[in-house]
Amino acid sequence: MKIKNTVQFTLIALFLISGALPGFAQAKNGFVKIFNGTDFEGWHLKIRSDDAELAKKVYAIEDGMVHVFKDFPKEYELNTGDNATHGLFYTNKKYSKYILKFEYKWGVGIANNFDQFQYDAGCYYHVADDKIWPLGIEYQVRYDHTQKKNHTGDFWAGGLKWYSKDGNSFLLPSEGGQPVLGHGGEHLAAPDVKSNALNGKWNKCEVIVMGDKYTIHKLNGKIVNMATELPYSEGIIGFQSETAEIYYRNIQIKEFDEIIPMENFLK
C-alpha cells in the first residue's frame, strides 16, 4: 500500500508540474485565457435586438474562436438601418490594471451599416455599462477598403489626453508628439503600421492599461496609440459585432496589483 500511495503521489505531482490541469495550463508568462474556446462561461452576450437566440448565432464558437456572423448570408440586412445584430460579448468581471491580448482576422461577409463604416468591429474596455454603445474606451478594429486605410488601434473615446504632432494621428512623445486635450470621438492611430486586412491572416492586438493613468494600444508588436488621464479607472471588456464577419481568438489577460510605470512599456 505504501508503494502504491507513493506512486500515486508521484503521478499527481508530475501531472501538476506539467500544467495538465486546465486552470494551470491556461496561464503563460502571467497571462490567463479569459475565453475558454468552448463556451461563454464568464461572459454575457448583448445585441441591439435583445434576441438571446439570435445573439448565440451572431457569436458562434468554432475551433476555439468566436466567429462573428458565421452562418449568415454574405450580405446580411445590408444598409437597412435596422442594425439588429450590432452588439458585444462582454466579460462579467471588471478589470483595472492589465495587459489584454487578442487576435482577429476578417471574413468575407458584410452586414448592417457597412457602407457607412466598412469592416468595422472593436474591443471596448473600462466599460461602465453593457450597452450596445457603452461608456468606455474603444480599441478600434476596422479596415476601410475604399481608401485602403487601416483604422485598427484608433481610440473612440472622449475625456482623455492624447498625443499627436499634427492633431491628426498619434505620435509618440519621444518622436515629437504633444499632449492634445478635448479631442473627442476618434483618435487616429499611427499610420503605416503593418497589418493584415482582407488576406485571411491574423492580427495581434494588445491593450496595456493602468487604471485611469494611461493606456497603450499595440498592433502586431508596434505601439500605434497612447493616452493618459483616462476618464475611467476600471470596467468590463467587450468585443464587437458590427458591420463585417470577423474571427476573434486567444483572448488573454495579465492583471497587476500595482501601477506599472508607462516608461516600462515604451522602451
Residue ranges with predicted function:
Residues 26-267:
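Carbohydrate-interacting regions of secretory-pathway proteins
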Residues 1-27:
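Bacterial Sec-dependent N-terminal signal peptides
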